[in-house]
Amino acid sequence: MIRFLSVSLFSITFILSKEVSIKSIELSGPITDRKQEISGMDWYNDNLFFLPENQGGFLFMITKSEIQNNLQKDDQKPIVARQTKFSTPDYSKLIPGFDGFEAICFSNENVYISIESEHNDIMSGHIAWGTIDKKTFEITIPPKNIKKVKTPTQISNMSFESILMHDDHALMLYEANGANLQRGAYHILFSPKDQNTSRIRSVNIEYRITDATRVDENGKFWTINYFWPGDKKALEPSRDLIFENTPKGDSHQSSNIVERLIEFEIKNKRIIFTKSEPIQLVLNEDSPRNWESIVRFDNKGFLIATDKHPRMILSFVPFN
C-alpha cells in the first residue's frame, strides 16, 4: 500500500510538472524588425492583428488560414505579414511622456488601445478608442477619444499591458500585482458609453501579467505570467503560491526565469484563479523570451508573441 501510494504521488507530481514545448511560426517582412516591438495582438474575425509599440501609422495582419496551413505543413514557408493603416493623433505631442502602445482589443468594429506614458517620474496609463473599416481594415482613432487612467501603483515602465472586453466594458489589466506591491490588487473597467472608469478587485499574482486572451462565455481568460530576473528589484517578488501548489517543470527547476500561462475568471465582481493547472513553457535558458501578446487559437491552444527579446517570435502553444 505504501509503495503504491508513493508511486501514485510521484505520477501526480510528474503530470503537474510537465512543461509544454512551443512551435514557432515563421514570419517575414518588416514585422520581424526588432524596432517594431510587437506589444499586443487580437483577432478581428479571422484576421490576427499585431500592434507595434512604436507609433508608425500601421499595424500588421495575417490570416487564420495562413497560420493553420503553416502549422499543418512540414515544409513551412514564412508568412508575410501585411501592413494595415492605423490612423491616430500624434500621441508624442498629445500625451506628455508618451512611451508607446501596450495592448489592443476588438469588440465588433470597435477598437481599444492601451497607451503608456511616464512624465516627471510618474507612470500613467491611457485608453484610446476608435473603429475599424470592415473592408479596408483601416483603424481610425479620433483625437478626442482618449482617457487618462491612474495606475494602481508606481513602478517605472509598468502600466496596463492587457485589454479585454467584459460586459460591455474594456477591462485594463495592470501588469504588476504582487503581494509586496499591492495589498488589495485591482484592475480598471472602462465604460465606452460614458467614459467613466471603475475598479475590479483581483487576487495577487507575482511577476508580470503581460497580456490576456478574450473572456470566454464562462467568464474565464488566460494570461501570460512572465518573470525576467532583471526585474526582481522593481517587482519585489513575494512567495510564488502558484509554484508552491504546482511543482516546477524541468527547465523551470534550474532557472529563475518564469514563462507560464495562468487562467483567471471573473466571478462575483472579482478576478480570481480558476482550478486549471498553469501551463509552463519549456524555457530557452540562453535567451529569455519576453512574451507580450496572447490570443486563443480556436480550441487547439494559444498563439503567443514576443516584442524584441530575443527577437520577434510568434509561436503556437498546444493545450496538450
Protein language model regions, located:
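Hydrophobic h-region of N-terminal signal peptides that target proteins for export
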Residues: 8-17
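Sequence/structural signature of beta-propeller domains
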Residues: 16-320
